[in-house]
From Swiss-Prot:
Highest taxon above the source species: Viruses
SUPFAM superfamilies reported in the protein's UniProt record: RING/U-box (SSF57850)
GO molecular function, one term: RNA binding
Entries under Pfam families matching the protein: zf-P11
Domain observations: The RING finger domain is essential for the inhibitory activity of protein Z in transcription and RNA replication. Late-budding domains (L domains) are short sequence motifs essential for viral particle budding. They recruit proteins of the host ESCRT machinery (Endosomal Sorting Complex Required for Transport) or ESCRT-associated proteins.
Physiological role: Plays a crucial role in virion assembly and budding. Expressed late in the virus life cycle, it acts as an inhibitor of viral transcription and RNA synthesis by interacting with the viral polymerase L. Presumably recruits the NP encapsidated genome to cellular membranes at budding sites via direct interaction with NP. Plays critical roles in the final steps of viral release by interacting with host TSG101, a member of the vacuolar protein-sorting pathway and using other cellular host proteins involved in vesicle formation pathway.
Protein name: RING finger protein Z
Keywords: Host cell membrane, Host cytoplasm, Host membrane, Host-virus interaction, Lipoprotein, Membrane, Metal-binding, Myristate, Viral budding, Viral budding via the host ESCRT complexes, Viral release from host cell, Virion, Zinc, Zinc-finger
Family statement: Belongs to the arenaviridae Z protein family.
Known partners and oligomeric status: Interacts with protein NP; this interaction probably directs the encapsidated genome to budding sites. Interacts (via RING-type zinc finger) with polymerase L; this interaction inhibits viral transcription and replication, Z partially blocks the product exit tunnel for the releasing nascent RNA product. Interacts with the glycoprotein complex; this interaction plays a role in virion budding.
Protein species of origin: Lymphocytic choriomeningitis virus (strain Armstrong) (LCMV)
C-alpha cells in the first residue's frame, strides 16, 4: 500500500479558453448570432459571438457549432472589461 505513483498535476492552459464578455455595450453593436437579441454575457465562438443561453442549448445538442462548424467553446475565461473611460489627459 502506498506504492503507487501520484499523478502529475496538469496546469490549466488559458490559451484554449474562450473569452466571455460580461457587457459588450462599449464594443458597439455586438449580439448573439443565434438569437440576435442578447448583448450581455457573450462568449466568443470561432468568428462570432453566442450568448450563454444559446451556448448551453447548442452544447446540449452537439459539440459543434451549427453556424461555423467549429467545436463549441466549453472552457471560459472572464475578460477584463473597462469599468470606466480612460483618464482624461491634457
Amino acid at each position: 500500500m502506498g506504492q503507487g505513483k501520484s499523478r502529475e498535476e496538469k496546469g490549466t492552459n488559458s490559451t484554449n479558453r474562450a473569452e466571455i464578455l460580461p457587457d459588450t455595450t462599449y464594443l458597439g453593436p455586438l449580439s448573439c448570432k443565434s438569437c440576435w437579441q442578447k448583448f450581455d454575457s457573450l462568449v466568443r465562438c470561432h468568428d462570432h459571438y453566442l450568448c450563454r443561453h444559446c451556448l448551453n442549448l447548442l452544447l446540449s445538442v452537439s459539440d459543434r457549432c451549427p453556424l461555423c462548424k467549429y467545436p463549441l467553446p466549453t472552457r471560459l475565461k472572464i475578460s477584463t472589461a473597462p469599468s470606466s473611460p480612460p483618464p482624461y489627459e491634457e
